[in-house]
Amino acid sequence: MAKVNIPIPNDFVKLILISQGHLGGIKTSKLMERYVFGTRKLENIKVIDIEKTWEKFILAARMFCSLKHPSDAVVVSTKTFGRKGVLKFCESTCATPVIGRFIPGTFCNNQVKRPLEPRVLIVSDPFADKQAVIEGSHVNLQTIAFCNTDNDVSFVDIVIPMNNRSPVSISAGLFILSRLIRFMKTGEPLDENMKEVELFIYRDPIELEKLVEEQKIIENANITIGEQELYEQEEFGNKAGWGIEPSLVSTEAVSEFSDNWKN
């Protein structure tokens, strides 16, 4: 593959490393060996080459941008933690989301309730979304898939080598792909407002409850500290003689002071 003209931003490299998107599995399939950079000796985990991942991101974004109508691209994820990222990706790129259970015959049976006739298929995991990948091959769909080192890449046209077993890494991959698509279409900067990646990440309800409780504890602690500081300031003011309220000063004393000053 020719060297890409779009350099990968440092923020994207940090995002892939933090989300552990560069960490594959212990095993490697034959067709995924070309994307392996090395092996961690302690855990025996394969490390994916980020440069090759970036090349495939650009290739996938170019395929998406070649569509006349973005809704002709269908994004599928049967995993629970991949649904939010898919919905946010489709909101950003105007693609068609398919989340939850994939109904057999969606692509090749017109008798189903909501048949689809897309031109491009994007899946978060070719193993979990195997039914969609197989049906896409029957109707000659161009398939883009986020693949781990031990995935079978049969019927996949563009492989994006990335960790697809982590909720954060899948969300990071969809975020990067959406940014590339918007950059190619509108020229929007790639690394602008990187905090938007939080909108792609799935949060478990139990985890959200813990975060809310922690936030309440922090707020209560801040309120307690603020009240203590206010109390200490009042005590200091009273000791220094600053705690006299204006209402306690008589008007006669003020007028007498002003008369003496005039004289």
From Swiss-Prot:
Pfam families: Ribosomal_S2. It is found in: Cytoplasm. Its main location: cytoplasm. Signal peptide: none annotated. Keywords: Cytoplasm, Ribonucleoprotein, Ribosomal protein. The keyword Ribonucleoprotein applies. InterPro entries: Ribosomal_uS2, Ribosomal_uS2_euk, Ribosomal_uS2_euk/arc, Ribosomal_uS2_flav_dom_sf. GO terms for molecular function: structural constituent of ribosome. Disulfide bonds: none annotated. The keyword Cytoplasm applies. One of its GO terms (biological process) is translation. GO terms for cellular component: cytosolic small ribosomal subunit. Component of the small ribosomal subunit. Mature ribosomes consist of a small (40S) and a large (60S) subunit. The 40S subunit contains about 33 different proteins and 1 molecule of RNA (18S). The 60S subunit contains about 49 different proteins and 3 molecules of RNA (25S, 5.8S and 5S). Interacts with RPS21. Belongs to the universal ribosomal protein uS2 family. Required for the assembly and/or stability of the 40S ribosomal subunit. Required for the processing of the 20S rRNA-precursor to mature 18S rRNA in a late step of the maturation of 40S ribosomal subunits. This is Small ribosomal subunit protein uS2.
